[in-house]
Design a protein with these regions (language model features):
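Negatively charged, low-complexity tracts enriched in Asp/Glu with abundant Ser/Thr
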Residues: 2-7, 47, 51, 55-100
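Serine/threonine-rich low-complexity intrinsically disordered regions
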Residues: 5, 32, 46, 65, ...
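Intrinsically disordered, low-complexity regulatory segments enriched in Ser/Thr/Pro
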Residues: 11-51, 106-146
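Ampiphathic alpha-helical segments that act as solvent-exposed interaction surfaces
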Residues: 44-66, 130-166
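Generic hydrophobic segment detector
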Residues: 58-73, 101, 107-120, 149-160
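Amphipathic, soluble alpha/beta structural segments
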Residues: 68-84, 88-90, 146-174
């Protein structure tokens, strides 16, 4: 969608969107001296609703990635907040139950990435993206949401889901 190279710009914020069969999770991503972490609060919403997706993305973009202390080391041995919400047995189980979007916001663009499936049902490695697109920031949160929804219509690899988004009625068959 854009030929702007986000590599030349420093990111403004980075967000992870987890699409599940029945909902989406958009955790708060904090910035620490040891890297970024997904933490609570976690927005849960119906991703099939364009308005709900736009509202969740807009709130995340406004919040950005707050600076925070590194989560306690003992948390590494515990399930992540996303695993708990989903009832996943492990991170691998969470990956098998979800489609993940990395959303990098830059001053002039937004880069969206989503990974294909590996043979074991988890997300493929970083070189095997099912989506890797740069959207001009001028497209707004609406453009980002629309790109996510368009991509989800092409995916057939989320357990328990058939993507059947509401379609406008036409004179034929209405």
């Amino acid at each position: 969608m854009s030929n702007v190279n986000p590599v030349t710009e420093k990111s403004v914020s980075w967000h992870g969107l987890y699409i599940l069969a029945d909902r989406a999770l958009l955790p708060t991503r904090i910035e620490t001296e040891q890297g970024d972490f997904d933490v609570e609060p976690i927005r849960q919403f119906d991703y099939r609703s364009r308005l709900a997706l736009i509202e969740a993305l807009a709130a995340a973009f406004m919040t950005g990635n707050p600076e925070a202390e590194v989560p306690p080391i003992e948390n590494k041995k515990k399930p992540t907040p996303m695993e708990k919400l989903v009832g996943a047995k492990s991170w691998t189980d969470l990956e098998r139950k979800s489609i993940y979007f990395s959303i990098m916001v830059y001053p002039s663009t937004v880069r969206l990435e989503s990974w294909a499936r590996a043979s074991d049902g988890t997300w493929s490695d970083e070189k095997e993206t099912a989506l890797d697109i740069t959207i001009p920031l001028s497209a707004g949160v609406e453009g980002v949401a629309d790109t996510i929804l368009e991509h989800l219509r092409t995916r057939r690899d989320l357990p328990g889901v058939t993507f059947d988004f509401p379609q406008p009625k036409t004179a034929k068959g209405a």
